[in-house]
Amino acid sequence: MDTMRQRILVVDDDASLAEMLTIVLRGEGFDTAVIGDGTQALTAVRELRPDLVLLDLMLPGMNGIDVCRVLRADSGVPIVMLTAKTDTVDVVLGLESGADDYIMKPFKPKELVARVRARLRRNDDEPAEMLSIADVEIDVPAHKVTRNGEQISLTPLEFDLLVALARKPRQVFTRDVLLEQVWGYRHPADTRLVNVHVQRLRAKVEKDPENPTVVLTVRGVGYKAGPP
């Protein structure tokens, strides 16, 4: 197997959908593995070490929300939820449990591939770049965040969100702009993605998430970096 090919784990009990996803993703140059059970998905992630997980919300064994929560306890692997539900509560629960993004069924294959590529994009040849917000230091090429020498563990998406804010400390970012820059959306989308991930980021980087100094809310507009 080509070691440069990225591996996608598809977790879905719908065999026909899983087969379609496999065909589409392999056609785009990805390796794929398919699991149809939530509990087995946890073992598969440990054994296969995928670069990204496509995770259905409704699964036998363990539902997607619980799978997401368990994975996030010790893994930063990108997770994109697949859901047929339009229920706001389920989407938000999934995001709060650690999913990076979600896509509603039915979806166009090109849209799915774009979401996957947005979560996998990484530049291994990034030049040296050190950023800071308040007392938080960010080593961009090392993908490392510290406060007073203590490392703060972030998922790749949380890291990208923090870097986007830190690179333009005077700019107030609307949610739509963050969706484009961090998630790779090219059209208006669900701004709850931004709100939930800001909450998750604050829980990790703020000394007091209720009184943030790193990621500030600009009421009626969006978010900005706190003062250095």
Curated annotation (Swiss-Prot):
Signal peptide: none annotated. Induction: Expressed in culture (at protein level). Constitutively expressed in infected human blood-derived macrophages and mouse macrophage cell line J774A. Autoregulates its own expression. It is found in: Cytoplasm. Residues 7-120 form the Response regulatory domain. Gene3D superfamilies: 3.40.50.2300, 6.10.250.690, Winged helix-like DNA-binding domain superfamily/Winged helix DNA-binding domain. SUPFAM superfamilies: CheY-like. Its main location: cytoplasm. Residues 128-227 bind DNA. GO terms for molecular function: metal ion binding; phosphorelay response regulator activity; transcription cis-regulatory region binding. Disruption phenotype: Essential, it cannot be disrupted. There is a cross-link at residue 207 (Isoglutamyl lysine isopeptide (Lys-Gln) (interchain with Q-Cter in protein Pup)). It holds the Pfam family Trans_reg_C. The modification 4-aspartylphosphate is found at residue 56. One of its GO terms (biological process) is biological process involved in interaction with host. GO terms for cellular component: cytosol; plasma membrane; protein-DNA complex. Its cofactor is Ca(2+); Mg(2+). A divalent metal cation binds at residues 13, 56, 59. Keywords: Cytoplasm, DNA-binding, Isopeptide bond, Metal-binding, Phosphoprotein, Transcription, Transcription regulation, Two-component regulatory system, Ubl conjugation. InterPro entries: CheY-like_superfamily, MtrA_REC, MtrAB_MtrA, OmpR/PhoB-type_DNA-bd, Sig_transdc_resp-reg_receiver, WalR-like, WH-like_DNA-bd_sf. Phosphorylated by MtrB. Autophosphorylates very slowly. Phosphorylated protein binds DNA better than unphosphorylated. Pupylated at Lys-207 by the prokaryotic ubiquitin-like protein Pup, which leads to its degradation by the proteasome. It comes from the Bacteria. PANTHER family: DNA-BINDING DUAL MASTER TRANSCRIPTIONAL REGULATOR RPAA (PTHR48111:SF21), REGULATOR OF RPOS (PTHR48111). C-terminal domain binds DNA and interacts with MtrB. Member of the two-component regulatory system MtrA/MtrB. Binds direct repeat motifs of sequence 5'-GTCACAGCG-3', phosphorylation confers higher affinity. Overexpression decreases bacteria viability upon infection of human THP-1 macrophage cell line, due at least in part to impaired blockage of phagosome-lysosome fusion (upon infection bacteria usually remain in phagosomes). Infecting C57BL/6 mice with an overexpressing strain leads to an attentuated infection in both spleen and lungs. The level of dnaA mRNA increases dramatically. Probably a monomer when inactive, phosphorylation may permit it to oligomerize. It can oligomerize, and interacts with MrtB. Co-immunoprecipitates with DarG in the presence and absence of darT. This is DNA-binding response regulator MtrA. The lineage of its organism: Bacteria, Bacillati, Actinomycetota, Actinomycetes, Mycobacteriales.
